[in-house]
Amino acid sequence: IFESTSLPSAASSRGCLLEFTDANPVGCSFGAGSPSKTFVLLGDSHADEWSTPLAALADSEGWRMVTYLKSSCAVAKIPVFNIRLHRISSECAIWRSQALDSIVRLGPAAVIVVEFSSGYIQGPHSDLGEHAVDLTTWSAGLENSLRQLQAAGIPVILVRDSPTPATNIRNCLSYADWRGVPESHCATPRSLAVSSTITDAERSVAEAVPGVRFVDFSSIFCDRTSCPAVRGGIIVYRDRDHLTTSYAKNLAQPLKELLLPMMNSEATASAGPLQ
């Protein structure tokens, strides 16, 4: 269990997921040396989870992926309280602003946005207490950031965050193994793991901003009623809310089907060099 939940992502293994006190964005490149098209992965540690299948896709298709990733920092323009630093993260605000500016200068064929939405919004999955934002503030902040990309003519794929388990999956599976109880003991009801309120709010934001497409991959993680801890013999989560790199590889094909039309569009030009 420990080994299967400890494999780092493509981006984090190269130090591309910035820490809490880092403010200056770092663009990391993956894929082809002379790419036909470039796309960007933008977000927090929940976006980092997707870097492994996306890096493999960039390699296989002759594309370039550029990542802009920072732990515990929302793409949505909101004040983010960092519980480790015990304060509002000024580093997050600086990083977000500069990362968006860098992406606009880069001019990619598409930007994929993923973030731990339920971690920032008031509700059962946030540890921020009174510092979590309400849904209206979140939606307005998300729309603000997406409109900056839209104004530059950059297509955006807004991906609904992966479902959030009710417990630390690695600990739960270890305990289940010790007690001799089935893995299903660690499953989470879909109604709890997937907030329909947040899903609907983010879909509405995407519909309000031209050039933004909302995508929900929840069915890759859950069946109609439950989100298992193990699917197809693969552990889905490495902790309370992050995907294992092994399971994230299952996202390669649906991500390819999603990106191909955008990357092959004649309307999207090749991006320039990183600055």
Features from the language model and the residues they span:
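Extracellular/periplasmic envelope-modification machinery, especially enzymes
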Residues: 1-275
